[in-house]
Amino acid sequence: MPPHGRLSHPALKVLRVFLTAFTENVRSEIAGADIMKSAGISSGTLYPILLRLERAGVLASRWEKETPQDLGRPRRRLYRITPAGAAIAHEALNDLASPSTLAPNEA
């Protein structure tokens, strides 16, 4: 995983979605389509980010257990943030929000 300072803005938006869902106890697993809506990014941007974050151990995923016939739609891949990923996300987002990282006219 690159240092959090090298995380792209869209990757930080994705991590923020997970932290928000986790801290609000809304749900522990989130489908890609829901992440897209919450983060406001396209599927072409989202899925490569999810793959990189999963390979780095920041996220984990699984397929829904139900079959497409049971669901009446294709199965979804569900993503969750790992404990290590939560620590990385908190640190990256806190650093991003700290006054020392803001431009002089933003402080």
Regions found by a protein language model. Name each.
Residues 47-54:
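Short, hydrophobic-biased segments on the C-terminal half of alpha helices
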Residues 37, 54-55:
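Alpha-helical residues within the helix-turn-helix
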Residues 1-3, 84-107:
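Amphipathic alpha-helical dimerization/coiled-coil segments
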Residues 8, 82-84:
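Residue-level signal for threonine
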Residues 56-72, 80:
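Beta-hairpin "wing" of winged helix-turn-helix
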Residues 75:
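Exposed loop/turn and edge beta-strand positions of beta-sandwich/beta-sheet ligand-binding modules
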Residues 38, 78-80:
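Short aromatic/hydrophobic contact patches that present stacked aromatics
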Residues 5-45:
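N-terminal helix-turn-helix DNA-binding core of bacterial DNA-binding proteins
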